[in-house]
Amino acid sequence: MNLVLLGPPGGGKGTQAKRLQDKYGLVQLSTGDMLRAAVASGSEVGKKAKAVMDAGQLVSDEIVIAIIDERLDQADVAKGAIFDGFPRTVAQAEALDAMMAKKGKKLDFAIEIRVPDAYIVERITGRYTCAKCGAGYHDKFQLPQVAGKCDSCGGTEFARRPDDNVDTVTKRLDAYHAQTAPLLPYYDKKGSLKLVDGTMDIADVTKALEGILDASK
């Protein structure tokens, strides 16, 4: 089984991909991880990617597809893959479909974890961590049991990521919508698009995703 997880930054894709990976034996494929692995392996396509990255340029869709092609031939992906962060455009989706068709494979689902922008802004801008041990907290959803004191290590200093501000998050969301909006009708026409409410609790989102995957068996 192969699926694409779509959803905004901060929408919980990574968490859910890990849960599905653990339950179904699927392999989460993130383009960043695959690029780094290809470069480290010294393969032909990895060398091409390294040359482009060293020149400070964006890696082309053609190279990314070649890296995915190579990755799908590896034994650990036999049960299927979860594509996280790719495709981002219709052109990439078409290239991915064509490449998989050559292998006799297909994408079974494109699942959008849908979360309203206001939720994402609240989730991301409220995040902070213990400066000492890295334990995560949130202004609204996960406060320390004792105000100003880390539950894990007792530290009293906390930090926020500079990018976790309203302006930056809004720009990232705008870019996501501009890129991804055309993918939804593309996959809908193919009959593979499914929607899951990402505002539910993490466990409930997982149940909804499992329901989609289990129904296809």
From Swiss-Prot:
InterPro entries: Adenyl_kin_sub, Adenylat/UMP-CMP_kin, Adenylat_kinase_CS, Adenylate_kinase_lid-dom, P-loop_NTPase. It is an enzyme of class 2 (transferase). GO terms for molecular function: adenylate kinase activity; ATP binding; zinc ion binding. Its main location: cytoplasm. Pathway: Purine metabolism; AMP biosynthesis via salvage pathway; AMP from ADP: step 1/1. It comes from the Bacteria. Residues 126-164 are annotated as: LID. Zn(2+) binds at residues 130, 133, 150, 153. Disulfide bonds: none annotated. It catalyses: AMP + ATP = 2 ADP. CDD domains: ADK. Signal peptide: none annotated. SUPFAM superfamilies: P-loop containing nucleoside triphosphate hydrolases. GO terms for biological process: AMP salvage. The keyword Ion transport does not apply. Transmembrane segments: none annotated. Coiled coil: none annotated. Keywords: ATP-binding, Cytoplasm, Kinase, Metal-binding, Nucleotide biosynthesis, Nucleotide-binding, Transferase, Zinc. AMP binds at residues 31, 36, 57-59, 85-88, 92, 161, 172. ATP binds at residues 10-15, 127, 200. It is found in: Cytoplasm. One of its GO terms (cellular component) is cytoplasm. Belongs to the adenylate kinase family. Consists of three domains, a large central CORE domain and two small peripheral domains, NMPbind and LID, which undergo movements during catalysis. The LID domain closes over the site of phosphoryl transfer upon ATP binding. Assembling and dissambling the active center during each catalytic cycle provides an effective means to prevent ATP hydrolysis. Some bacteria have evolved a zinc-coordinating structure that stabilizes the LID domain. Catalyzes the reversible transfer of the terminal phosphate group between ATP and AMP. Plays an important role in cellular energy homeostasis and in adenine nucleotide metabolism. This is Adenylate kinase.
